[in-house]
Amino acid sequence: MLHTQQLTTMLDLQQKMNAKVNPEWINAGYGFMRAAMVESVEAIEHHGWKWWKAQEKDLPQLQMECVDIWHFALSHILIEYQSDVEASAKVIAQQLSESETALTFDGNIYKFAQQDLLNNLELMTGLAAAKRFNVSLFMTIIAQCEMSTDTLFEQYVGKNILNFFRQDHGYSRDLGGKS
């Protein structure tokens, strides 16, 4: 499970990145959950779902998409708590400790452990489209992507450093791919 210090570090880094892009980011109305939804769909693509086409699951790319989703989810949570890093960390830690195992969405009950990765990614996509994020569902997906929370933390910090580099040197797709 992510520790409070890890959460605080990630939220602080995310807040600094967002402020670097736009000092008024908190009130800019950016579609962070829309971005998380797009990343979720990209994760589905990397999982492979087309029955008419031979596809293999690209686990490293799936993991990278999860890290991208986490960036946008942290931004969404920071906005909900008026950019208060400590309050945001506290609410995430509380959600992690509660370890929800299911949620109701659109009148249906979804039990995370009874769904495979692809179905959990679809559920996360639907939630993101509805501007909602469920930490427990995300952590289930992280586990299904064969990542530990420490790996999520390490990859998040690494990607954040890359994003700062991109901002400092003019964001370009030839600096290492997508955001």
What is the predicted role of each segment?
Residues M1-S179:
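Flexible "arm" and connector segments at domain edges
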